[in-house]
Curated annotation (Swiss-Prot):
The keyword Isomerase applies. Belongs to the eIF-2B alpha/beta/delta subunits family. MtnA subfamily. It comes from Parasynechococcus marenigrum (strain WH8102). GO terms for biological process: L-methionine salvage from methylthioadenosine. It is an enzyme of class 5 (isomerase). InterPro entries: IF-2B-related (IPR000649), IF-M1Pi (IPR005251), IF_2B-like_C (IPR042529), Initiation_fac_2B_a/b/d (IPR011559), M1Pi_N (IPR027363), NagB/RpiA_transferase-like (IPR037171). The active site is at D225 (proton donor). The record marks C145 as: Transition state stabilizer. Pfam families: IF-2B (PF01008). This is Methylthioribose-1-phosphate isomerase. The keyword Chloroplast does not apply.
Length: 337
C-alpha cells in the first residue's frame, strides 16, 4: 500500500492527513484558515515535529491570502505545540522572508512554504540513508512513538530508517512501544510499517526492559522534538526510560535529529519547555473512563534524555557522536532551504 502524504497544498487551502482517525480511516482535513491549522496542530490531527513545522508555514500562507495579521498568526501557531523546535524554525524562516514584509506577497510566501516542504523531504531522505548505514545486517530495532513518513513531509526519521533498512535487507524486525497515552506506536507506527510490509510487534511501554534483558533488541532508534546545544534530547515521554535501560544492557541508543530539530540557543534540556496535555488523555480513552473516578493524572507530553545516554545523533549532515556541544556548534544550521 502506498502511504498517503502528511499534507498537501491545493493552491487556496491546506489538506492535512487526520492522524487522529488512523488506522481505521484515511481522511484529510480541508483547512482554509490559519486558525484551523493551529487547532489541527494543538489537537494532534497532524503530528511529528517536521510535519507540524511545514503545516504551520502553510498556515502563514493562509493568513496572508486572507490579508490577516501575520504577527498574530505566527504567534498563535508557535504556541500550538511549545516543545517541538521545528515549529518555530519554520515560522521564523517564513516570517523573515522578503515576501512577509509589507506589502505582503502571498504567492511569495507560498513559494517559501513549498521550499520548506521540499527541504524536509531532502533532509529526511539523507538522514535515513545515514541511519541505515549504522545498523548491522539482521538488526532488531526498538522504536518509541511515531516518526514515520506521515510525521514529516518526506520519508520519516527513525521509522524511516527502519523502513528503508528493511527494504535494503538490514532490519529484520521492529519492536514498537505502544506509546501511552495517545498510542502513536500502536496506531500510527504499526499501521505505517504494516503498509510497507515491515515485520513488527507492538509492546506495552513497560515491556521494553524485559525485551532488552532477553537480548531481543540490537538497537534503540527514536526521533526527537528538540536537541539542545549540549546534546540533551526532548522526545516523547518514555524516551528517557528507554535510554536508561538501553545503557544498562549495552544497547546503542540512536536519536534521529534533522537540523530543523536542533536548537543551539537552548543550553541544555532543563531549559526546554515541556508541554503538558489534558489529564483526560490518561484517564479516558475514546470517551470511556479508564481511571478511578476522581483520580488525578499528570500528562507531560515529552521528557528529556541527557546527552550522555545518546550513543549518536543521526542527522542529514552525518552521524554525530559525543562530545556533542562542539559538533553541534559546527553544523551549518543557518542555511536557508
Amino acid at each position: 500500500m502506498t502511504l498517503p502524504p502528511s499534507l498537501r497544498w491545493t493552491g487556496d487551502h491546506l489538506e492535512l492527513l487526520d492522524q487522529r482517525r488512523l488506522p481505521e480511516e484515511v481522511s484529510f482535513l480541508k483547512l482554509h484558515q490559519w486558525r484551523d491549522v493551529a487547532e489541527a496542530i494543538a489537537t494532534m490531527a497532524v503530528r511529528g515535529a517536521p510535519a507540524i513545522g511545514v503545516a504551520a508555514a502553510w498556515g502563514v500562507v493562509l493568513a496572508a491570502q486572507a490579508n490577516e495579521d501575520l504577527d498574530l498568526a505566527v504567534s498563535v501557531l508557535k504556541s500550538s505545540r511549545p516543545t517541538a523546535v521545528n515549529l518555530g524554525w519554520a515560522l521564523d524562516r517564513i516570517k523573515a522572508s522578503p515576501a512577509a514584509q509589507e506589502p505582503v506577497d502571498p504567492q511569495g510566501l507560498a513559494a517559501v512554504a513549498a521550499a520548506l516542504e521540499a527541504d524536509d523531504r531532502a533532509r529526511t531522505q539523507t538522514l535515513v540513508d545515514h541511519g541505515v548505514g549504522l545498523l548491522a545486517s539482521g538488526s532488531r530495532v526498538l522504536h518509541h512513538c511515531h516518526t514515520g513518513a506521515i510525521a514529516t513531509a518526506g520519508v520519516g526519521t527513525a521509522l524511516g530508517v527502519i523502513a528503508a533498512g528493511h527494504a535494503r535487507g538490514v532490519v529484520r524486525h521492529a519492536w514498537l512501544d505502544e506509546t501511552r497515552p495517545r498510542l502513536q506506536g500502536a496506531a500510527l507506527s504499526a499501521w505505517e510499517l504494516g503498509c510497507l510490509g515491515v515485520p513488527c510487534t507492538v509492546i506495552v511501554d513497560g515491556a521494553s526492559g524485559l525485551l532488552m534483558r532477553r537480548q531481543e533488541v540490537d538497537a534503540v532508534l527514536v526521533g526527537c522534538d528538540r536537541v539542545a546545544a549540549n546534546g540533551d534530547v526532548a522526545n516523547k515521554v518514555g524516551t528517557y526510560n528507554l535510554a536508561l535501560v538501553a545503557r544498562a544492557h549495552g544497547i546503542p541508543f540512536y536519536v534521529c535529529a534533522p537540523g530543523s530539530s536542533m536548537d543551539r540557543s537552548t543550553s541544555d534540556g532543563d531549559a526546554i519547555t515541556i508541554e503538558e496535555r489534558p489529564q483526560e488523555e490518561i484517564t479516558q480513552h475514546r470517551g470511556q473512563r479508564l481511571a478511578a473516578p476522581g483520580a488525578a493524572a499528570w500528562n507531560p507530553a515529552f521528557d528529556i534524555t541527557p546527552a550522555h545516554l545518546v550513543t549518536a545523533l543521526i542527522t542529514e549532515f552525518g552521524v554525530i557522536r559525543p562530545p556533542y556541544r562542539d559538533a553541534l556548534q559546527a553544523l551549518p544550521l543557518d542555511r536557508q532551504p
